[in-house]
Structures are given as structure tokens and as C-alpha cells.
Amino acid sequence: MKKIFYLTLILIGIPTLSVLLIKPKEKEIIEKKYMFEKNTKVRVKRVEKNTIETIPLEQYLIGVLSGEMPVSYELEALKAQAVAARTYTLKKMETNKNNQFDIVDNTNDQMYLDNNYLKSVWKENYDSYINKIKQAVNETSGEYLTYDGQIIKAFFFSTSSGKTENCKDVFGENLPYLVSVSSTWDESSPSYLDKKTFSKKDFYEKVNLPYEDELDIEITRNDTNSINTITINDNEMKGTDFRYELDLK
């Protein structure tokens, strides 16, 4: 009988995108009102359609908030997410002003769901759900975050392993407002102990390594106790790359 081996991964300690809004000793993150024109638009690359749509900024944020946070969350949580999403978008618009588009509509930037899609999935709940999302966006209209007078890179995440990551460990860039802190309340998240199970064959395919009967895995950890590198049968890769290859949260 052919034996099938399975590898189960507990998703703890693998770096994810994280944002930490802190108040350093000399400088601080400040929430400001962005005095943009009412017709300010964001150029969104719709990846599956391979098109670029120009969408009013605040309307775009309604689609982002719908895609990035469950509508069942408390209004104040949705409002905080709206500020983070607006900040992230403004930074991308600033960075990509000379490019064809500002931002993409998937998790490479922010998940954006258009109105037609939301109607199809929310069905009879559409009106109440969309009104709650709109309230969160409207009540934070124009609000964004800066550090030392500059719009911050407002990366955000769903669930950490109990600590956020240093920006340098994930993106290779030192940012004083993106440093590791304890985030123990993430332990109550339904995603905290998420796991994925792969057959050995699928696992090798996903990490682009030749199949071997013997599977030897070694890991090193960084200062936050997250996975820094993972070595699979003498092939070393970064923990962040391993996460992306296996599509881990």
C-alpha cells in the first residue's frame, strides 16, 4: 500500500505584515486630517481583469474595509482600520504618482471588493452591512497618520504570534514606528492556531524543492522568537519567503 505522509504546520512564529503605532521619545505618530479635494481618485489595478480603474478615494476605502475586516467587528475597530487603510493608500499614491497605477486590489496591497461582488455575497444583509462600513469610513473622513511630518507606511495584519515584527526583519527597512511589541491579545483570535496540512509531495512542490523521502527541517529565530530562517534538506530560505510560498497567514 502506498504510504502518504502529511506535514502539519502550526502558524505561530512566522512573520507577517504588521503595523505598530507607537509614541517614541522624541517624535510621535500624529493623526491628521488630509485636506484633499473631494474628487481625489486612486488608480486601482484590478489584477484578475487586468484593468486599471480610477475610483474616488473614500469610495475605494469602502471596498477595502469590506475586504480587510469582518463587518461584524465593532464600529471603532472598523474606524481604526479605515484610518490605517487610508494612510496606506495615500502613501502608495505618493510613491506611485508617476506610475500607471497606485495600488493593486489584492493582498499584495489591500483587498478591494467592489459593490457588485458585495451585493452577491451579502445578499439580504447588503444594506445594513454597507451602511456600517460607510459609517466607519465617513466618521474618519480624511484622517491619516504621519511620523515626522511624513505619511507613514501603515502595514497591518490580522493575527500575530503574540508579538509584532520589527520592520527590518520583514522588509529589510528600519522604521522607528514599526518595531516589535507584545500583542498577547492575539491569542484570542480565531486564527491564532490556524494550521494547514500538506502531503509531502505537495509540500516539496510549494517550496520548489525536489522530492526526498527524508524531510529534515531546521529553523533559526530572530529577537522576537519568530522564524528567521528555515532550512529544508540543506536548502535555506527566509521565514517570510516560506510563509509566502505556502500561503500562510
Regions picked out by a protein language model, each given a short descriptive name:
Residues F5-L21:
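Hydrophobic membrane-insertion alpha-helices, especially the h-region
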